[in-house]
Curated annotation (Swiss-Prot):
GO CC list: cytoplasm
Pfam family, one: EF_TS
Protein name: Elongation factor Ts
Similarity remark: Belongs to the EF-Ts family.
């Protein structure tokens, strides 16, 4: 197979995503004609990479923020070019004002035209701050979490000021439990858990089916290459999928605060204690810059040496 041109950017990104070696990453990209996702699977089939990292690639600065008001809450992300701006009080105040309006606005288009205390729209206020701060600022996304009865838990990781930081999480618990203090404490703990464990879905039914099929295919082909018989492989795949669920499905994950129990078991215990049904209806996790791509300016000499040959 003739080698295609593989850029240093892609090799570096694949290494960061999989933990595989530089040469292995380059070979995987060549073998898959530069297809990034296929290269990940190629490495995993060869046993050269760990499971795909659950967190998205962080590629932007700024702040995420949450606001909880009774049974309704909002989370937003506002991006800046540098972390220095994220520590700027004027920028922090801007983000606070925007998240306070987000609950009322309900969607990002309405939020952008919502009026701030200055009388200007959010969009206009952002433009004014760009001129003052000297960096490009973007209201990237927002989401709403609302429940009819129960508790909303919120958590912000790496807070720079209260409710603003690098990772923001909201968790909604629907319940008729009378002890709201204990219910709110549970919601808070689950929010912290979500921040640290980054689940992809609440339960197995809501998990993207393509992720499950991809995991099955990768593990099946890896086991087949190792020469294992099909009837053994099938049982191993079943076990691997159970493990996969324990890694990415919230209810199947071991609870951060009680590792011997799953989140589902913790909720069941809480239901018995509070004499009421408890259901996680939704969770939202915003990690700053998640999924945003940007060009790298400098690379290690080893990257250049490997990819320019």
């Amino acid at each position: 197979m003739s080698e295609i041109n593989i850029s240093a950017v892609v090799v570096k990104e694949l290494r960061e995503k999989t933990g595989a070696g530089m040469m292995d990453c380059k070979k995987a990209l060549i073998e898959t004609s530069g297809n990034f996702e296929e290269a990940i699977d190629f490495l995993r089939k060869k046993g050269l990479a760990a499971a795909v990292k659950k967190s998205g690639r962080i590629a932007s600065e700024g702040l995420t923020a949450v606001k909880v008001d009774g049974l309704i809450s909002a989370v937003i992300e506002v991006n800046s070019e540098t972390d220095f701006v994220a520590r700027n009080k004027q920028f922090q105040d801007l983000v606070k004002d925007i998240v306070n309006l987000a609950i009322i606005a309900q969607n990002i288009d309405t939020l952008k035209i919502s009026k701030m205390q200055s009388g200007k729209s959010v969009e206009e206020e952002i433009i004014d701050n760009i001129a003052i701060i000297g960096e490009n600022l973007t209201l990237r996304r927002m989401d709403i979490l609302e429940i009819s009865n129960g508790a909303i838990g919120s958590y912000v990781h790496n807070e720079v000021v209260p409710h603003l930081g690098k990772i923001s999480v909201l968790v909604g618990l629907e319940s008729n439990a009378k002890d709201k203090v204990k219910l709110e404490a549970l919601a808070k703990q689950i929010a912290v858990h979500v921040a640290g464990n980054n689940p992809q879905s609440i339960d197995t039914l809501s998990l993207d089916k393509s992720l499950i099929e991809r995991e099955k295919k990768v593990f099946f082909e890896k086991s087949k290459e190792e020469g294992k018989p099909n009837h053994i492989i099938e049982k191993m795949v079943e076990g691997r999928i159970r493990k996969f669920f324990s890694e990415v499905v919230l209810l199947h994950q071991n609870f951060l605060f009680e590792p011997k129990l799953t989140v589902a078991e913790v909720i069941k215990n809480a239901e018995q204690e509070l004499s009421a049904e408890i259901k996680i209806t939704k969770f939202i996790r915003y990690a700053l810059g998640e999924g945003i791509e940007h060009a790298e300016k400098n690379f290690a000499d080893e990257v250049a040496a490997i990819t320019q040959c």
